[in-house]
């Protein structure tokens, strides 16, 4: 899937320049693996990750937003629009 827009400044820098500033050092490898899986997949059914990623769609006010667990309360979240990843974010929404 194509990543169309990124909300988190550090995550954007990481994707565009491989610059880790703005991302906790202990999360970098896990984030790299998650992003690689998302880009390699044609759709969400093709995202193969370990059970610890806990891939799911949010409900309530954020219904339709996808979430993938990074570590502790940290999540990669994004929306899918026309098969493209939008509003990619790294956040603690708990």
Language model regions located:
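Enriched for short, Lys/Arg-rich terminal
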Residues: 59, 66-94
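Short, solvent-exposed, low-complexity loop/linker segments
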Residues: 24-51
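Residue-level signal for pocket-adjacent positions within structured domains
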Residues: 1, 9-10, 18, 42, ...
């Amino acid at each position: 899937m194509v990543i169309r827009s990124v909300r988190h400044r550090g995550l954007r820098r990481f994707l565009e320049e491989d610059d880790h500033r703005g991302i906790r050092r202990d999360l970098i490898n896990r984030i790299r693996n998650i992003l690689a899986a998302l880009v390699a997949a044609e759709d969400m059914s093709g995202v193969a990750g370990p059970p610890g990623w806990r891939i799911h769609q949010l409900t309530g006010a954020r219904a339709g937003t996808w979430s993938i667990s990074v570590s502790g309360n940290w999540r990669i979240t994004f929306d899918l629009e026309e098969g493209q990843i939008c509003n990619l974010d790294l956040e603690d929404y708990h």
